[in-house]
Amino acid sequence: MPLGLRGKKKAAKSKETARLVEGERSGGSQGVPGPPAPARRLVFHAQLAHGSATGRVEDFSSISELYAKIAGVFEIAPSEILFCTLNTPKIDMGKLLGGQLGLEDFIFAHVKGIKKEVNVYKSEDSLGLTITDNGVGYAFIKRIKDGSTIDSVKTICVGDHIECINGENIVGWRHFEVAKKLKELKKEELFTLQLIEPKKAFEIGPRSKAGKTSTEKIGTSRGTLRLRSKGPATVEDLPSEAKAKAIEKVDDLLELYMGIRDIDLATTMFEAGKDKSNPDEFAVALDETLGDFAFPDEFMFDVWGAISDVKQGR
């Protein structure tokens, strides 16, 4: 199907995946199967990023389930959690929790802090913002370009959740919808953002110390737990260096063309194209799985080029 004539198709059903918790059978000395070994429980340690005791979370298969588990441990509402970082309580956008969770990772949940309202004059076509979301309805600022319109407004910070644009509540919108809304704002006019910043951390020594020792408690496996919006989570091997570079390139293209960063979306796009032989097959595969995004053709060709480079060893 030519790229220009792509139609939306019903998303292909994902193939059945392994259970989150699996047991292994050990063989007896006489060749008779022994009793099943105790099921392995995947337990992760978590803290509130602004300071708290350490809690334990387990038995979840999606981001929303994980947030509910964390909220239950710390007796807060799941809607209070803006996003999570891995192995650091800092607002480090390179350490965001997405659809993959290392089996040794320590989770820090960043919760709602101060609300603020900011008026911005759109002097340029581009605001200099990169948007991402937490997978459960909260879009937030992942990057601010140096010297941009937003960079000049010092009250707007990386990590701020965008709650409203010009009075319109956007909770529940995906990152690409928020980016599109911001891009469509008229140049040389004022607009208003209602933001919620993450609760600020108290500088408590023991908290960072706990983060350093957490991996000893969790285990030594180097796999990752892949969280999915539908179906069970699965334990997978870490991606190869070549695959990781290709996914990062796709993520860079998402930022360039759409003003978003989403490593899980980039991974899904890579997986859709890795066994395709030409860009038209790739376009059909993306329409089946990600048709709602309506990616531009030029973007699709660039993504196909990034995937092809990896397949050809470049």
From Swiss-Prot:
Q: Which UniProt keywords apply?
A: Cytoplasm
Q: Where is the composition biased (Basic residues)?
A: 1-12
* Region: Disordered, residue numbers: 1-36
Q: Where in the cell is it found?
A: Cytoplasm
Q: Which SMART domains does the protein's record reference?
A: PDZ (SM00228)
Q: Where is the PDZ domain?
A: 117-197
For bias type Basic and acidic residues, the affected ranges are 13-25
Q: Which GO terms describe its molecular function?
A: identical protein binding
Main location per the UniProt record: cytoplasm
- List the GO terms this entry assigns under cellular component, sorted alphabetically: cytoplasm
InterPro entries in the cross-refs: GH2_GIPC, GIPC1-3_GH1, GIPC1/2/3, PDZ, PDZ_sf
Database matches in PANTHER family:
PDZ DOMAIN-CONTAINING PROTEIN GIPC2, RGS-GAIP INTERACTING PROTEIN GIPC
UniProt similarity note: Belongs to the GIPC family.
Q: How does it assemble?
A: Probably interacts with SEMA5A.
- What is the recorded name of this protein? PDZ domain-containing protein GIPC2
The organism encoding this protein is Rattus norvegicus
